């Protein structure tokens, strides 16, 4: 098996800026902001009020239903207010603001050292749900929901997505290098509740140290294998990852579980280990702060709720005026206009790019070269879909498989006419999904 997929691109990686640097531990100094919607599903409900004193690890907002997630304080301090605050999505979200007392007093956690074969499904799911763990690769889907398919016996593969195919991002790589034991234990905990499943850790072959480290530690483990995949973007996209590692194809109407797979990010399985083994809630994560406009690009172990500007200052600030600020990776991240934004559970990176790294070019007419079709991993025709989107022809857009687009950005990247193909298609997809909810 070749562990790859049709299409894709090879953009500048930029990982050399941070991949071999030690992770920096950062304790925040300013107010902490906790948006009540850091996940897919219903926003969490605050259970604290203005003036309450809280400790790090304390529950401050509880899940509002099954498809939702708990939120915990990551520092000790006093609840200042609950009000809408700007997030990296560009929208204002109701948020709990805590005045950081800089004491970092933490609740006592209850560890669980039961052997894997004695862990019950109920206690694993309960620990994950109480810890507020969500997918940390970007989507933010509540993990306890993902681990609750209709039939456990139908799940054949638990895949840890360690591809980290976005340029500049190296936090997952550092997590494997520095904390591989917890990553492996987190996967083994998940496998313990899926009796028929095999484990796969999928890593791109531009990370030979991580591959060798995992292979050495998993030597003799018949239930987990490490797949070294050819480096190509978007190898880490869920549908492409599943196809590359299992040969199974899923479309936009399916969930990975429909193909017998569950996919987790590296940081997610690490958090599962900490929740089950240490009783620790999700209050921190690794984030990459990088780009050619950052003075000291690095990975930071930060408290969730920390202000973006504090994290940039931790990386010694800007080395030059940034022309573009991005929350997440340069291909699928969100452009932001301010650094007064809180880091959330799904914050993987903050990028600051100078004019030299950002191409500002006016789009022109399609020249019908077909490059966008060649690189599209979703097997659709981006040029045609973008034209239908521009015409607002939603019926034809759906009929021509517009909903199969994963918004990876490959088409926009290669387009010689510099058409904003991904953005045009994404806008229409959003409209279709909104109409379905009515």
Where in the sequence are the language-model features?
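Flanking helices and flexible, charged tails adjoining ferredoxin-like Fe-S electron-transfer domains
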Residues: 101-132, 137, 168-169, 247, ...
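Ferredoxin-type iron-sulfur electron-transfer modules in oxidoreductases and energy-metabolism complexes
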Residues: 347-363, 373, 377-438
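Hydrophobic alpha-helical positions that pack around
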Residues: 196-308, 314-319, 329
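N-terminal, Lys/Arg-enriched amphipathic/low-complexity engagement segments
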Residues: 1-47
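Gly-rich Lys/Arg/Thr-decorated short loops/hinges at beta-loop-alpha junctions or inter-strand turns
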Residues: 106, 135, 158-172, 293
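Short, well-structured beta-strand-loop connectors
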Residues: 49-62, 81
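Histidine-anchored nucleotide/phosphate-binding helix
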Residues: 177-192
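Conserved hydrophobic positions within beta-strands
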Residues: 77-79
């Amino acid at each position: 098996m070749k562990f790859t997929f049709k299409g894709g691109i090879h953009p500048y990686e930029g990982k050399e800026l941070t991949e071999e640097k030690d992770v920096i531990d950062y304790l925040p100094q300013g107010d902490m902001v906790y948006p009540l919607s850091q996940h897919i599903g219903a926003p969490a409900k605050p259970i604290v009020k203005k003036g309450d004193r809280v400790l790090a690890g304390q529950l401050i907002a509880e899940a509002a239903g099954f498809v939702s997630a708990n939120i915990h304080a990551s520092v000790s301090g006093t609840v200042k207010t609950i009000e809408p605050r700007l997030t990296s999505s560009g929208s204002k979200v109701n948020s709990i603001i805590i005045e950081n007392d800089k004491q970092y007093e933490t609740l006592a956690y209850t560890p669980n050292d039961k052997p894997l074969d004695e862990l019950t499904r109920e206690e694993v799911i309960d620990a994950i749900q109480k810890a507020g763990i969500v997918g940390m690769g970007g989507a933010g889907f509540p993990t306890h929901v993902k681990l609750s398919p209709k039939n456990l016996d139908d799940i054949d593969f638990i895949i840890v997505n360690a591809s980290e195919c976005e340029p500049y991002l190296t936090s997952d790589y550092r997590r494997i290098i520095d904390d591989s034991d917890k990553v492996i234990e987190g996967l083994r905990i998940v496998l313990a509740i899926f009796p028929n499943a095999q484990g796969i850790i999928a890593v791109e072959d531009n990370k030979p140290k991580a591959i060798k480290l995992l292979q050495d530690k998993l030597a003799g483990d018949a239930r987990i294998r490490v797949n070294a995949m050819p480096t190509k973007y978007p190898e880490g996209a869920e549908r492409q990852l599943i196809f590359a590692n299992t040969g199974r194809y899923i479309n936009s109407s399916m969930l990975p579980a429909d193909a017998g797979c569950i996919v987790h990010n590296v940081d997610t399985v690490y958090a599962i280990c900490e929740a089950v083994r240490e009783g620790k809630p999700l209050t921190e994560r690794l984030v990459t702060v990088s780009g050619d406009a950052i003075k000291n690009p690095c990975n930071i172990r930060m408290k969730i709720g920390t202000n973006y500007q504090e994290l940039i200052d931790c990386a010694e600030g800007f080395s030059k005026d940034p022309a573009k600020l991005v929350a997440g990776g340069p291909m699928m991240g969100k452009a932001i206009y301010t650094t007064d934004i809180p880091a959330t559970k799904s914050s993987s990176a903050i990028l600051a790019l100078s004019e030299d790294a950002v191409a500002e070019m006016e789009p022109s007419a399609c020249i019908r070269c077909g490059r966008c079709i060649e690189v599209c991993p979703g097997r659709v025709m981006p040029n045609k879909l973008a034209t239908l989107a521009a015409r607002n022809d939603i019926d034809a857009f759906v009929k021509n498989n517009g909903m199969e687009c994963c918004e990876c950005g490959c088409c926009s990247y290669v387009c010689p006419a510099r058409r904003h193909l991904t953005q045009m298609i994404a806008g229409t997809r959003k409209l279709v999904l909104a109409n379905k909810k009515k």
